[in-house]
Design a protein with these regions (language model features):
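Gly/Trp-centered helix-boundary motif
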Residues: 1-135, 139, 147-150, 161, ...
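Short helix-capping/hinge motifs at transmembrane helix termini and TM-loop junctions
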Residues: 74-82, 142-146, 171-180, 184, ...
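Short alpha-helical transmembrane interface motifs in multi-pass membrane proteins
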Residues: 29-30, 118-122, 137, 153, ...
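Short, conserved catalytic or interaction motifs in soluble domains
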Residues: 145-146, 160, 164, 177, ...
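Amphipathic cytosolic juxtamembrane alpha-helices at the membrane-cytosol interface
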Residues: 106-121, 125, 145-153, 222, ...
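Generic hydrophobic transmembrane alpha-helix motif, especially the helices
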Residues: 98, 108, 129-133, 142-143, ...
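Glycine-rich helix-loop "coupling/hinge" segments at transmembrane-helix boundaries
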Residues: 171-175, 188-193, 205, 221, ...
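Transmembrane helix boundary and interhelical loop/hinge segments in multi-pass membrane proteins
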Residues: 219-229, 326-334
Length: 337
């Protein structure tokens, strides 16, 4: 038996006690207003959507991921090593050696990718150390407050007035031999494989790059310090460490991410400069800075030996800077409309 659709007209609706105007179809203006309404989204979901809408940042992120994968996989699957020599000395790009070879017959592509590993390792480790020191220092200053906060922040201001590059160079020279002597002890065999040069770079870079992180974290925590939910937790007897861990730091994650992304390119640039002047990793381990220095002698005849490491350094720093700016725009509440 077929079902027929029966529509109610105006008189029929009035008999039912309904006003026809209340159930009339929506007008074009009402439909347009309804289409503009969107369901509410959380902070992180909104930040991710804003980041994905930044096309330039997505392109740079893809390039950065590609460089990281090449740095990991090419030295693994290549038949050459970073220190292995071949009879082909100063050879141009070929199928066997896409970037050519250097004056000792070593494959430049493998050495550039291995140097990229070193640069990325320096950037990531420095970022982790900076987060550890800066977050702890800023959280203590913000929570304790008063005279202790003033003294701690004045120390940060004093450290920021010191010419960091000069001190970094001096400390790299001073710390190299003590660290090398320490690593000769069998109990430090795990760190000995990293090398005294890299460890000294980690130490000196973390020593001067945590200052901005500490100030950012302190400012974010002070902004949330007087919020009602924090005061309620204190009134209920919550410990200071619990309040900082559960309430204050989670609300400062966006600021921490923004500050951390700025540390990586700065650390990579400083490490490349130190390696360029001979204070980086020890030979024969390649670094992008040391490879650029080695290419200086033949820059007229073999300019590409200088171009390859320099281009990778510039590209990595550019990618991190663009992605960092996009993260700042996405995570900063002041940028949200």
């Amino acid at each position: 038996m077929e079902k027929t659709e029966k529509r109610l007209d105006g008189p029929a609706l009035e008999k039912l006690g309904l006003n026809p105007e209340d159930i009339a179809p929506a007008t074009a203006e009402e439909r347009a207003a309804s289409d503009q309404m969107r369901p509410s989204v959380g902070y992180w979901k909104d930040a991710m959507q804003r980041f994905r809408r930044n096309k330039l940042a997505m392109v740079m992120l893809g390039i950065l991921i590609f460089i990281i994968l090449c740095a990991i996989l090419i030295p693994v699957f290549s038949p050459y090593t970073y220190k292995g020599r071949t009879p082909d000395v100063r050879q141009g790009p070929t199928w066997a050696h896409p970037f050519g070879t250097d004056k000792l017959g070593r494959d430049i592509l493998v050495r550039v990718m291995y140097g990229t590993r070193i640069s990325l390792l320096v950037g990531v480790v420095t970022m982790l150390l900076v987060c550890l020191i800066g977050i702890s220092y800023g959280a203590i200053a913000a929570w304790v407050g008063g005279l202790c906060d003033n003294l701690m922040m004045r120390f940060v201001d004093l450290m920021m007035t010191i010419p960091s590059m000069l001190i970094i160079i001096l400390l790299s020279v001073v710390l190299r031999d003590p660290i090398k002597k320490m690593l000769s002890d069998p109990q430090w065999n795990a760190l000995a494989s990293i090398g005294s040069g890299l460890i000294s770079i980690f130490a000196v870079l973390a020593l001067f790059n945590w200052l901005g992180m500490a100030r950012s974290v302190r400012g974010a925590l002070l902004m949330n310090r007087t919020q009602e939910y924090v005061l309620a937790s204190e009134a209920m007897g919550a410990k200071a460490s619990w309040v900082v861990k559960k309430h204050l730091l989670p609300n400062a994650v966006g600021i921490i991410i923004i500050s951390a992304t700025g540390v990586v390119p700065s650390a990579i640039m400083t490490e490349s400069f130190l390696s360029f002047i001979g204070l980086g990793v020890a030979a024969p381990v390649p670094s992008l800075g040391s490879m650029a220095n080695d290419a200086l002698n033949g820059i007229i005849s073999y300019p590409m030996n200088m171009v390859y490491p320099a281009a990778i350094i510039c590209l990595i720093i550019l990618c991190f800077n663009v992605v960092g700016d996009a993260l700042r725009d996405a995570l900063d509440p002041r940028m949200r409309k």
